């Protein structure tokens, strides 16, 4: 059985005050039935690590990682640096990185491999724009993004978490219906099964990321192939984040 995960992606938001508030909120969270992860901006990883008690079981992650391990790459952050700060996971291929920083599937694959070299678990994002969905190209776009990662082979893919983020539902207030989310998640799992076998595909966690809120989380997480969520704006509210975590518990 796949253990649910709720991962908070603060994006370029937050403050030291929020770090402290979140630390207090998560101090007593029960992670026995659901994995809880928070990905703050890079400067807040250290403070959040100190604010959240080690015994809580809450994990920390980065929002991005360099495809390079070290060198003259101003502004980049290496996987080993994230690991040294206590991160266990890192988001790779988020739609905002793909769109705003022109990250190609090739770059995403390089970052996946860089994260794994550092001992991090990549959360690999795939998803389609509104134009692609309206054109009936959801499976074509998501399949292409997914295939680039699946080609790395089962030994790599079994170490990943996938996240489906319909770009048209990120920060827009629009949310994929549970039926829409389940349909794409089922497609992703079947694509993985076709490439690498059903046993691996059934173990592969697939998160949903697209305007998940306390009010819709339970219904979305109730879908057969949805294994939790990659939470954006709602992860900035400690009380709301706790509600979403509660909704993910089996």
UniProtKB/Swiss-Prot annotation:
Positions annotated to bind substrate: 9-11, 171, 211, 232-233
Keywords in alphabetical order: Cytoplasm, Gluconeogenesis, Glycolysis, Isomerase
Sample GO molecular function, one term: triose-phosphate isomerase activity
Recorded metabolic or biological pathway in which this protein acts: Carbohydrate biosynthesis; gluconeogenesis; Carbohydrate degradation; glycolysis; D-glyceraldehyde 3-phosphate from glycerone phosphate: step 1/1
Family classification: Belongs to the triosephosphate isomerase family.
Entry EC number(s): 5.3.1.1
Active site: 94 (electrophile), 165 (proton acceptor)
NCBIfam families hit by this protein: tim
Predominant cellular place of this UniProt entry's protein: cytoplasm
Subunit and interaction comment: Homodimer.
Protein name: Triosephosphate isomerase
Lineage top rank: taxon: Bacteria
Reaction catalyzed: D-glyceraldehyde 3-phosphate = dihydroxyacetone phosphate
Keyword Nucleus: no
Pfam families for the chain: TIM (PF00121)
UniProt enzyme class: isomerase
């Amino acid at each position: 059985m796949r253990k649910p995960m709720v991962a908070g992606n603060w994006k370029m938001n937050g403050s030291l005050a929020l770090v402290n508030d979140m630390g207090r909120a998560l101090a007593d969270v029960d992670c026995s039935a659901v994995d809880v992860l928070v990905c703050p901006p890079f400067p807040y990883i250290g403070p959040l690590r100190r604010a959240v008690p080690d015994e809580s079981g809450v994990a920390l992650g980065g929002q991005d990682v360099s495809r390079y391990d070290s060198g003259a790459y101003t502004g980049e952050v290496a996987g080993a640096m994230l690991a040294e700060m206590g991160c266990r996971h890192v988001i790779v291929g988020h739609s905002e990185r793909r769109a705003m920083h022109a990250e190609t599937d090739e770059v995403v694959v390089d970052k996946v491999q860089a994260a794994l070299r550092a001992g991090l678990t990549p959360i690999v994002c795939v998803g389609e724009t509104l134009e692609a969905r309206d054109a009936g190209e959801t499976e074509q776009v998501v399949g292409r993004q997914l295939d680039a990662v699946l080609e790395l082979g089962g030994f790599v893919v079994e170490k990943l978490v996938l996240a489906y983020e319909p770009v048209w539902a990120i920060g827009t207030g629009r949310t994929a219906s549970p039926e829409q989310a389940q349909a794409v998640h089922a497609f992703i799992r079947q694509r993985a099964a076709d490439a690498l076998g059903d046993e691996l595909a059934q173990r592969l966690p697939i998160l949903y990321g697209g305007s998940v809120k306390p009010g819709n989380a339970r219904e979305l997480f109730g879908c057969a192939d949805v294994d939790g969520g990659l939470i954006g704006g709602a992860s900035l509210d400690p009380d709301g984040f706790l509600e979403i975590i509660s909704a993910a518990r089996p």
